[in-house]
């Protein structure tokens, strides 16, 4: 047991399973077979807030470097690969322009507006990493200014203040206004999840209650989508962020009671979720262009295409994880020191 009331375990199998299903939900959304699948991003952000609250106090001034080692290598590799395709085979991509300015901004996690009028870096899913990097920067600064155990809570407060400013007085269309979107509050929900689990009330609630809470949280997302459609701005925090927070609290509570996912495939996909997340739009596009796979759950051929595409996405993401992502991170850790 750590001195903050949390168990000393460094790995939560249920969180890894949540990562797997969150990544697959986003994949299914981009396959146009799961209209609420983008809620996987909300789950990722809450997980990030929880995990950073877990690791930041022990990492101190090494926190930001460790986050860079974990996030940057694969993102840069995929970004450079997409840029090369945009230069050599632009017809393979839809809205990606091979401008050096866009490459530099993408590599530095600086948001920009593309020719189609949408915000987004060269890697289509890199927009979420811009918010992740903002959170990491604020946490790293907080570790310098406040006690380590309060750093993520202070960072969440700063992001909430930034979000409030963007909503009240921000200038639409600016980078600051874009980064101040309400979705950044979900990192704070992850911090709340961590603080709730610190209180010790977890052990006073029976296991079936936590299972029920997790099921209700998962069901709340498609239910809210069926009733209200895709929520925007602050409504998204209430309708998708809060259930994601309840889900993470429930899953970690179950881990703490040794009720954990033992499915090796799910845990492996969770470990590969970052690779799956960054690669899948291009794997889906390639499956469409090369094999003519058009996912559609309303027809048998479309259902088979959906299963085949999902399988190819999972396999390519897993291979990328074990052949590219993990070796790069390990090599950097050997040179720079261990990373969490």
Predicted ranges, named:
Residues 1-15, 21-37, 53-62, 112-121, ...:
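Alpha-helical transmembrane segments in multi-pass integral membrane proteins
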Residues 47, 53, 65, 71-133, ...:
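Membrane-interface helix-loop-helix regions
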Residues 44:
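Structured binding elements
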Residues 27, 166-169:
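Flexible, solvent-exposed coil segments and beta strand-coil junctions
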Residues 67, 327:
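Conserved functional loop/turn residues at catalytic and ligand-binding sites
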Residues 39-40, 84:
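Short, solvent-exposed turn/loop segments enriched in Gly/Ser/Thr/Pro and often Arg
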Residues 17, 21-24, 40, 68, ...:
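Hydrophobic residues within alpha-helical transmembrane segments
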């Amino acid at each position: 047991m750590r001195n903050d009331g949390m168990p000393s375990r460094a790995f939560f199998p249920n969180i890894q399973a949540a990562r797997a299903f969150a990544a697959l939900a986003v994949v299914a959304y981009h396959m146009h077979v799961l209209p609420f699948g983008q809620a996987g991003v909300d789950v990722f952000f809450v997980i990030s807030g929880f995990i950073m609250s877990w690791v930041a106090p022990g990492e101190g001034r090494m926190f930001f470097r460790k986050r860079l080692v974990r996030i940057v290598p694969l993102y840069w590799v995929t970004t450079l690969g997409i840029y090369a395709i945009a230069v050599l085979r632009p017809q393979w991509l839809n809205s990606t322009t091979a401008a050096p300015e866009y490459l530099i901004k993408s590599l530095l996690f600086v948001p920009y507006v593309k020719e189609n009028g949408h915000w987004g870096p060269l890697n289509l899913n890199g927009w979420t990493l811009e918010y992740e990097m903002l959170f990491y920067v604020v946490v790293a600064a907080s570790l310098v200014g406040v006690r380590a155990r309060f750093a993520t809570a202070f960072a969440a407060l700063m992001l909430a203040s930034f979000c409030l400013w963007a909503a009240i007085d921000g200038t639409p269309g600016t980078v600051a206004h874009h980064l101040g979107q309400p979705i950044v509050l979900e990192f704070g929900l992850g911090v709340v999840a961590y603080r709730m689990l610190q209180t010790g009330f977890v052990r006073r609630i029976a296991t079936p209650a936590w299972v029920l809470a997790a099921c209700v949280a998962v069901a709340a997302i498609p239910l809210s989508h069926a009733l209200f459609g895709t929520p925007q701005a602050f409504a998204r925090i209430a309708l998708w962020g809060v259930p994601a927070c309840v889900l993470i609290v429930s899953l970690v509570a179950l881990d703490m009671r040794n009720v954990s996912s033992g499915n090796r495939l799910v845990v492996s996909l969770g470990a590969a979720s970052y690779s799956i997340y960054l690669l899948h739009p291009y794997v889906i596009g390639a499956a469409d262009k090369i094999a003519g796979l058009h996912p559609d759950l309303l027809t048998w051929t479309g259902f088979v295409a959906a299963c085949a595409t999902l399988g190819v996405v999972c396999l390519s993401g897993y291979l990328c994880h074990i052949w590219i992502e993990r070796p790069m991170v390990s090599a950097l850790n050997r040179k720079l020191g261990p990373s969490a």
